[in-house]
Amino acid sequence: MADQEVLVLRGTLEGHNGWVTSLATTPAHPDLLLSGSRDKTLIKWKLTGGEDNQYGIPKKSFKGHSHIVQDVTISADGAYALSASWDRTLRLWDLETGETTQRFVGHKGDVLSVSIAKNLRQIVSASRDKTVKVWNTIGECMATLTGHNDWVSAVRISPSDQSSTVISASWDKTVKSWDLADYSVNADFIGHTGYISCITLSPDGSLCASAGKDGVIILWDLNKNKTLYTLEAKAEVHALAFSPNRYWLAAATTSGIKIFKLQERSLLDELKPEFAVGATAKDPEAISLAWSADGQNLFAGYTDNVIRVWQVMTPSA
């Protein structure tokens, strides 16, 4: 029975000295995980799959940013990484060597999010300066998209080959869809009652999920530019990730990670590690998520600087 699947905590990856703010994987390198942190670095991990109780080993630390790294992503060909930082810049890195190959300078505030087109031609970034910027790969700003009236917390380019859509989310409580061809607004998605901190696009680019302060996840149909339905996370949401091969959505909330089954619009599982009980300490929270390319593992970055690895299992009846 496929519906009996649950997620089991399999291991941890330790190497960062600050909150793990972002995670990225790529089908081009199934044994690779990239993480970004408040410690100003990125770490490239080689995933070992649990041999010797180790789920992965840090292979390289990418240094160069002078402030918190807020977001990381990997190019579709698996050759490059991109990072967004509170130092107001983006960096393009050679994923193999860990060297910076390009800096992107122009934002007037912390850069909070970055995304690269599948064809590798365009890069978009979102900032506390309330703008989305569109760049080419040699670091030239091609356009500045204005329209949000508060911090732009997240931006994603559609993964679909046929699409030139960019989705952005803001603390102004709106999600916007932009056309990269002429930099116009396709649609404004209204519905959140608090700031939005994260968005994720489905693997085929047809769906967007957004969430944040109000504890409600809204699913949007990007083909028809309309609201589909909502899911109740019942807690502030820090991160979202669609499974690459199941109709699931993972949400990192202040009260644990929730896995929703989208077909049934129901909660499949809730992931809460056992933390040592502290007198005053809050439990660490998951603030970043990424599924492995095969959908069998969920990686979560936490505020105790640790990455936890959950595996999809079918309990033997």
Curated annotation (Swiss-Prot):
Placement of WD repeats on the sequence: 15-55, 64-103, 106-146, 148-188, 191-230, 232-272, 281-317
SUPFAM superfamilies in UniProt: WD40 repeat-like (SSF50978)
UniProt keyword Isomerase present: no
One GO CC term, this protein: extracellular vesicle
PROSITE patterns: WD_REPEATS_1, WD_REPEATS_2, WD_REPEATS_REGION
Biological processes, Gene Ontology terms: cell adhesion; cellular response to neutral pH; cellular response to starvation; filamentous growth; filamentous growth of a population of unicellular organisms in response to biotic stimulus; filamentous growth of a population of unicellular organisms in response to neutral pH; filamentous growth of a population of unicellular organisms in response to starvation; G protein-coupled receptor signaling pathway
Protein keywords: Cytoplasm, Repeat, Ribonucleoprotein, Ribosomal protein, WD repeat
Record's subcellular location: Cytoplasm
Top-rank taxon, per record: Eukaryota
Pfam families xref list: WD40
Keyword Chloroplast among record annotations: no
SMART domains linked to this entry: WD40
Phenotype upon loss of function: Causes defects in hyphal development under hypha-inducing conditions and attenuates virulence in a mouse model of systemic infection.
GO MF assignments: G-protein alpha-subunit binding; GDP-dissociation inhibitor activity; protein kinase C binding; protein-membrane adaptor activity; ribosome binding; signaling receptor activator activity; structural constituent of ribosome; translation regulator activity
Subunit and partners: Component of the small ribosomal subunit. Mature ribosomes consist of a small (40S) and a large (60S) subunit. The 40S subunit contains about 32 different proteins and 1 molecule of RNA (18S). The 60S subunit contains 45 different proteins and 3 molecules of RNA (25S, 5.8S and 5S).
Further remarks about this protein from its record: Has antigenic properties. Elicits a specific immune response in systemic candidiasis human patients undergoing malignant hematological disorders.
Family of this protein: Belongs to the WD repeat G protein beta family. Ribosomal protein RACK1 subfamily.
Protein task: Component of the ribosome, a large ribonucleoprotein complex responsible for the synthesis of proteins in the cell. The small ribosomal subunit (SSU) binds messenger RNAs (mRNAs) and translates the encoded message by selecting cognate aminoacyl-transfer RNA (tRNA) molecules. The large subunit (LSU) contains the ribosomal catalytic site termed the peptidyl transferase center (PTC), which catalyzes the formation of peptide bonds, thereby polymerizing the amino acids delivered by tRNAs into a polypeptide chain.
Protein name as it appears in the record: Small ribosomal subunit protein RACK1
GN (gene name): ASC1
